[in-house]
Structures are given as C-alpha cells and as structure tokens.
Amino acid sequence: MDISTWIITVLIISTLHAICTWKLYLKAGKKAWEAFVPVYNGIVLMQIINRPKWWMFLVFLPVINLLILPVIWIETLRTFGKKTTADMWIGVITFGLYIGYVNYTQDVTYEAKRELKPATKALDTLGSLTFALIVATFVHTYFIQPFVIPTSSLEKTLLVGDFLFVSKFHYGARTPMTPVAAPMVHDSIPLIKKKSYLSKPQIPYFRFPALQKIERNDIVVFNWPIDTVRMFRENSFEKQHKPIDKKSNYVKRCVGIPGDEVLIKNSELFINGKLVQLPSRSKVQFSYKVKFKKDAQFDINKLLQDLSSTDSYLIQADSSVVINALTDENVNQLKNSGLIDKIEKNISNDKEDLDYIFTIDKNSNITDVENALANLQENRGGVRYNKEEGRAIVYRLNDELLNAFKQFKGIKKTEPIYEIFPNTKEYSNWTGDNLGVVKIPEAGKKITLTTQNLPFYKMIITDYEHHDLQVNGNEIRIDGKPTNSYTFQQNYYWMMGDNRHNSEDSRYWGFVPEDHIVGKPIFIWMSFDLDNKFHKGFLERFRTERFFTTVSGEGQPESYFKYFLILLAGYFAWDWYRGKKKKKEADLL
C-alpha cells in the first residue's frame, strides 16, 4: 500500500465515522459538519466523551490504535447512555458500527457530566490493564525493546543468553508497517506458535528523525532481509513472504556503511582498502585446527572452559581438533600452554564442495533415492529431506556423490546452492574468508548496470525497491524500459558477526536495507547461560558480571548492578521510613 492509497483509506474510514456519528454530534451540541472533517472530527469526539485530545494521536499509531479504538467506541456508547455489558461487547465485536445503529435508531441522551469511572471493579481492572498494555506497546514500539541474543554469531562480544535493551530512537523509531498485529510479540504468538499478524494491509515505510547515523562497527539489530520462513529458525522448505517488520530479528556488527567498499582477504576485513580496526570490546573469533602433542595430558572440555570458548569442537581422524571459535588471546594462550605442536586458522581459499537441492518425483519409485539420503545422513550427516514437499538438500556434496545421485530416476531436478553473496555461478570461487571487492549502495547514487554487476543489485531492484526487472541477453529492462543505469532509493549496510566462522551474515545474503533497521543495543540488564555447555549449576549460570553493563564503549564493560541494588535498598528503606512516620503521625491524631 503506497501513501496515496493509505490517505484514501484514512478518508474512507473518516467518512464512515461521520456517517455513523453525525446525529450524536448534534445531540452533544456540536455541528453536523464537524463529524465530517478528518482528524478534527476525532478531536471534537474527544471533547464530547470528555477524554484527552491526545488520545487522537494514539489512533494514528499502528498496533496501538487496535487497543485504543475499542476504548473510544465503548466511551462513546457510555456517553450516550449505552452502558450495559451487552452494549460494550456489541460495540467492540461490530468494530464500532453499532454506534451507527444507535445513531439512526435510538433516541439517546447526551450525558455531558457522566461518571467517568467504570461502574464495576472488573471494568476498572480491565481499563487499567488496557492502558498498561497501551503504554507498554508504545514504549516497546518507539523507544526501548527487550531482546535476547539467540545465537553465537557475536560471541564473545555478546553472549547467547544476554538480555538486552534495544534503543529504537537512536537510529530513528520506525513506525510499524504491519498495522493488524498482536501487541508485544513479533512474528508468532508464544505457546500456540501461530502467526501474530495479518500480512495485509501494509503501511508505507516511515522513520522518525534519528539521534545519530549508523556508524562503522556499531552493533545493530535489524530484520533479516531474506527471511521467508513462517517462524524464526523453522526447518522447512516452504517459503512465505513476510512483511519487513515481521522478518526475524538479527543482531550483527555494521562493518560497512553506504558508499564503502568491502574486501575480505585471507579472513582479514578491509574497508575502502584499509584493514579494519575494531573497538576494544569486540572479540573477533575464528575457527582453528589444533594439533596437540602426543604426550599432552588434558581434558578438552576443561581446556575450552578455561579459554571461555563456548562454541563447538570436532576431533578429526588424525587426532587434531577443530575448535570453532578462538580469539587471538585464546590462540596465544594455547601456544604458551605447552600442549600443542601446531595451530592454524581454517581459511577457505578455494571453492568448496557445493550444497545441492534435489527436486524429487513423488509419483515415481523413489526408494533408491530415500535409501541413499538415509545412508548419507547416517554416515556423514548434512541432509535435509521433506518427503511431502518432494525436496532434499544435501550439504557439501562432492562430484562423485553428485553424479551418483543424478543417476536416480526419481531425481527430477538438481540445483546447486551458491552460498556466498551474490550467490551466482560467476562468483562461486568466493568464500567467507576471501571475497570482494563489493561496493555498498548509497541512496541517490547512480551506478552503471551491466550483466556482470547485476547479480549484486538484482535483489535490491526487485525485492527491496520493488521494480520489475527483465534481462534478455545483454539488454536490461527495469519497469519495461531498457536501461544501463540505476539510482538507489535508500541506503544499505554490510553486517558481519564477530564469530566469523559461525555467523550467517552479509557474506552470505548481501546488503541490509535501511528500512530493515530496528535499533541499537545499548544495555545488558541480565545474562544467563542458556546453552550450559559446561554443565553448571542453575545459580552459576547467571553471569552477574554482565548484569547492567553497556554494550558499546571503550575498555572492559563495568557492571552497574551493585549500584542498582544500592538504589533499590535505599528505596525500600525510604518507603519503610515514610510508612512508619505516617503511622506515628496518625497515632498522634
């Protein structure tokens, strides 16, 4: 829905409101025309029902308006004598249209000085809960949102189980684009695991003014651009288009801003030709292959615990150990431990075996295919098979196994997956440790389009900026017109995790559009070891040293938890003293 369509929708709703209420405006001593003027009619209605005019501001806030509108409908009915429980329920169930019935068929009286307080304790409680939910939703949507780190892509900078506060206003609060949605939840409703929103209608993208721009090395929360799963981390081939603001929330480090050039060479990150120097708090990790001495005596789990390495490891056939996440400090600790003969970073220099999608003919005999998939999964893993959908993914399939699968009659189609951006055969020699140069698009900047660079910008043109793109040989058509250039409509960013060999980031799916930006993590209020890989006791899993620490800044994070406890104790002491003083004064009276 574009802006003009949205304005027309607002006018239609305003007209419907006028048709349903103009006689009630007359009974309240107002003019009939006042019911027909958009926005102004709502302000007048607030005067009629004796409620604050700022309620009208809430009416225009997506999601919040779903909470305030039923309240306004009920208050309007009560103002004109319709105070029964049945009246209130009918008003809500009919989406306020019951007011139109009252407007034309009922001889009601305007009660200008009615009792505003709810008639029963139950209604009073319901009203209090409703406004508490409105306030919480307002804060959650436009100011601060709680967030939990779900994966180890930023380990050890941010840990799995860090409970964050994410600021919406640092980069400018984005208004919800999906107006019909359950408050205080994201894309699914907890427990029942059902979709929490209606995909249509959609509101045009709008962002309030920002306190600051996104800078290089900022940690940023954003909506995962290529998210097409029904729910976060769902293991299914079935795809579903999701609105921007209902795509899964990701958190990464912004290493490249609009206009930058990104190059990764032998795992080293270069921006605009210069080696990136990350903030002191960042803990970049890589995967290493470690060869221990034959006579070394150690417990691998205890060793990793001492290194605070919380990612996984793999013991290989030659007795070497692949440790998936080590910092430079960890590497030096191992080198000085006297336990190892050799340690080397796992760098992907050449094209590795590809992943493949097999489309399976469910109408033919597929026993051989299923047996081959089962044997492969049992012997080496890396197989996803959905029989109902007739599709399978086999990860890291070498040429010999690929040719064997192609001989099965049950295989209708074989598609390679090029996992590194821009995900095409032409750039299949790029890896997560060696790629680029990639130019990050900037709003308003024009580029020359060719069939060679089009893979980098195809998704921007079609998915993010919603143009029709057709390619016929060397001819490129956008919205039906031949062209050799394109001007970007918004800014884009390059996001990467600090845990470089265990992070799904821009190296795999490309640029993050500006309209996908959610906010800036600013504060860790609690941290709990969700994975518990070292089998700690329950209380030991609380990482109290991380309680009440800031996300950004220089030097080691300082916990403000003790100061919070002091303030909390002071508050309770003051409250106890105040209560005791009041009781003493009452006794004297």
Question: Where do the language-model regions lie?
Answer:
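Hydrophobic alpha-helical membrane-embedded or membrane-associated segments
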Residues: V10, S14, A18, V39, ...
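Alpha-helical transmembrane signal-anchor/signal-peptide segments
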Residues: Q145-L164
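Membrane-helix interface segments in multi-pass membrane proteins
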Residues: M1-I13
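Internal/C-terminal transmembrane anchor helices
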Residues: L116-Q145
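Cytosolic-side transmembrane helix boundary signature
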Residues: G91, F95-G127, R207, K247
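Membrane-cytosol interface at the C-terminal ends of transmembrane alpha helices
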Residues: L11-E111, F143
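Soluble "head" domains of membrane/secretory-pathway proteins
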Residues: P118, V160-L589
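Membrane-interface motif at the C-terminal end of an N-terminal transmembrane signal
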Residues: V135-I149, W574-K581
